[in-house]
């Protein structure tokens, strides 16, 4: 799946707010390196660097376009390309921070357990994931894909990502390994300029696998059909803007010191 840093940062303030909220719940760290998993263009990495300047910091991402943007943003910081599915967590980390990446990995709880095992005593695993598959913004992606005009391109392919496990599942799997685990949902309400702004937002994330699956000459038609559905699902408010509802799941697990 391809990514575009330029598309992603069109809504950088809105995308970075959950990272700020997650980082605010991370306690002081012991000595040891910190890792920003799925660092994207480096917006979350910058927050970690400002909060924990004394911990060596490494950004990890699978997409070279994102890494190029991150390296330009934070000159001299270490960034590495890796696919988290096959990535082996280095032992002795003080922090594994992951903002909006694990929702793409169907069996990510297994990896979360390995991350906790790799933490030093007192280290923290901090995770945020969009939990918005039941929102119109995402339901309409699949609905559009199932239309006769586009269905052939998606035949035999699973495009829609797997729903997140329940909060209880995360607690049950992680609690035996840590001193404290907190799991919570936050729902953000983003006022955006128009329904087209919602389309632009999801073009940077949720729509990517759908667009990648389509032939290049069909993407414009798919986007037009999807945008029309979005306009009906998100009517304008009195000032002309629309309100994007965006639920997110947060996990902070702290290992015993």
Swiss-Prot record:
Keywords: Cytoplasm, Methyltransferase, S-adenosyl-L-methionine, Transferase
Name of the top EC class for this enzyme: transferase
Subcellular localization, as worded in the UniProt entry: Cytoplasm
Cross-referenced Pfam families: Methyltransf_12
Coiled coil: none
Major localization listed first in the record, in broad terms: cytoplasm
Reactions this protein catalyses: trans-aconitate + S-adenosyl-L-methionine = (E)-3-(methoxycarbonyl)pent-2-enedioate + S-adenosyl-L-homocysteine
GO molecular function: trans-aconitate 2-methyltransferase activity
Recorded superkingdom: Bacteria
EC numbers on record: 2.1.1.144
Any one annotated GO CC term: cytoplasm
Biological process terms in GO annotation: methylation
PANTHER family registered for this protein in UniProt: TRANS-ACONITATE 2-METHYLTRANSFERASE (PTHR43861:SF1), TRANS-ACONITATE 2-METHYLTRANSFERASE-RELATED (PTHR43861)
Family, similarity comment: Belongs to the methyltransferase superfamily. Tam family.
Function recorded in the entry: Catalyzes the S-adenosylmethionine monomethyl esterification of trans-aconitate.
Record protein name field: Trans-aconitate 2-methyltransferase
Biological source species: Sinorhizobium fredii (strain NBRC 101917 / NGR234)
């Amino acid at each position: 799946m391809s990514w575009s840093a330029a598309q992603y940062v069109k809504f950088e303030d809105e995308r970075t707010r959950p990272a700020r909220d997650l980082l605010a719940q991370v306690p002081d760290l012991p000595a040891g390196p910190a890792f920003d998993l799925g660092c994207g263009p480096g917006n979350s990495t910058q927050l970690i660097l400002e909060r924990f300047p004394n911990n060596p910091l490494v950004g990890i991402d699978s997409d070279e376009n994102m890494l190029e943007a991150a390296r330009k943003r934070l000159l001299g910081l270490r960034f590495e390309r890796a696919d988290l599915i096959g990535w082996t967590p280095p032992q002795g980390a003080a922090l594994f921070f992951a903002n909006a990446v694990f929702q793409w990995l169907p069996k990510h709880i297994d990896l979360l357990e390995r991350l906790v095992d790799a933490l030093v005593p007192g280290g923290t695993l901090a995770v945020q994931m969009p939990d918005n598959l039941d929102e119109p913004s995402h339901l309409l992606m699949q609905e559009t894909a199932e239309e006769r005009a586009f269905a052939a391109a998606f035949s035999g392919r699973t495009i829609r990502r797997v729903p997140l496990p329940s909060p209880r599942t995360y607690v049950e799997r992680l609690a035996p390994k840590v001193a404290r685990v907190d799991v919570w949902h936050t729902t953000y309400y983003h006022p955006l300029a128009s329904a087209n702004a919602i389309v632009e937002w999801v073009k940077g994330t949720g729509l990517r696998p759908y667009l990648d699956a389509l032939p290049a000459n069909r993407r414009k038609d798919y986007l037009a059909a999807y945008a029309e559905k979005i306009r009906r699902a998100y009517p304008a408010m009195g000032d002309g803007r629309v309100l994007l509802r965006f639920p997110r799941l947060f996990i902070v697990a702290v290992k015993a010191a």
